[in-house]
A protein has these predicted regions:
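Conserved polar catalytic motif of the HATPase_c/GHKL fold
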Residues: 13-24, 80
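A short, flexible helix-to-loop-to-beta junction within the catalytic ATP-binding CA
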Residues: 23-31
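Glycine-rich/acidic phosphate-handling loop/turn and adjacent ATP-lid/helix
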Residues: 46-79
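Glycine-rich nucleotide-binding loop
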Residues: 58, 97-104
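Detector for a conserved hydrophobic position within an alpha-helical segment of the HATPase_c
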Residues: 85-86
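Glycine-rich ATP-binding loops of the HATPase_c
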Residues: 89-99
């Protein structure tokens, strides 16, 4: 019930885009043991966090807008995820470190 306050389309935009991008990224990994995707959704301190992580050996450089510089990890699609988060007063952040790409969507929790 953590996401009940979101419209179905918003959930599809966030979750669908995140999983599509993660899947596309790990498909190119030659080592099948490293084709890993982790997903977590939880509430904490009045917020709902959706976190998507995938193994990504090649560093993902982010531009000034916080999106990938190269057309990797669905740069244009991630704009729609950001828009969905911001519509609900939330944020989207991306991070790459030690072979892991992370997409986080933080939304204020509605009662």
């Amino acid at each position: 019930h953590l996401l009940d306050f979101l419209e179905t389309g918003e959930i599809c935009t966030i979750v669908g885009t995140a999983l599509d991008n993660a899947t596309e990224s790990v498909e190119t990994e030659p080592d099948h043991e490293k084709r890993l995707i982790r997903v977590a959704v939880y509430a904490q301190n009045g917020f709902v966090m959706l976190r998507f992580e995938n193994y990504c050996a090649q560093e993902v450089e982010l531009g000034a807008d916080g999106l990938p510089r190269r057309n990797t990890h669905g740069g244009s699609d991630l704009r729609s995820v950001r828009a969905a988060a911001e519509k609900r007063g939330g944020t989207m952040t991306l991070h790459w470190e030690n072979g892991w790409f992370t997409l986080r969507v933080l939304l204020p929790q509605k009662s």
